[in-house]
Amino acid sequence: MPFLKNVLPTSAKRAGYLDSMIPSPLPEPIPLLQAASIDTVMAALVAVPKQLRQKPGLHVVMLRDRRRVLLLESGALRQAFPVAIGMPGWETPTGRFKVLEKIDNPVWVHPVSGDRVADQSSANPLGSHWIAFHRDCLGRDAHDGETWITIEGCTTTGFHGTPHRWTVGRAISHGCVRLYNEDVRSLYRQVNLGTPVTVLP
């Protein structure tokens, strides 16, 4: 298959701009998430390993298979959020990370045209806030639906809002974790640089 060498501008190599670089195919439809029931949230909390529930301080735990982010404080559940995760082939990375960067009103730079889209625009795929937690500088090959591309330089995965509310609860992103804008605002206010983030399969 042909490979297209894609050299991203420096601004596009930063946090999560890859997430919206390639159009997403529509996934199989699933019911839209409603407000989380207490049972759903408690089941998610029980799925968190005991050693994580016993950690002191603030900790963000993502349960990828349940498409939930839990904000724990010394093991107690502070908040739970439904999320969208990476699609097959672009899975959200698992492991132990920490908050690397926070941006209020992020500006998204289109990786090809260089056009800038500000937060106030409904076209901004990052929504209202950006919280980076994972950086990958190994590069990768990816398929955009028509051709192969080589991603060069560093890409960053993080939590961000979305103008497309219907995507929350689906495996549809290019690795980033999408939240409703009101939820990412709440998470943004509560975490700091260095806050631990654990992503479980």
Locate the predicted segments by residue.
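N-terminal pre-domains immediately preceding structured catalytic cores
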Residues: 1-201
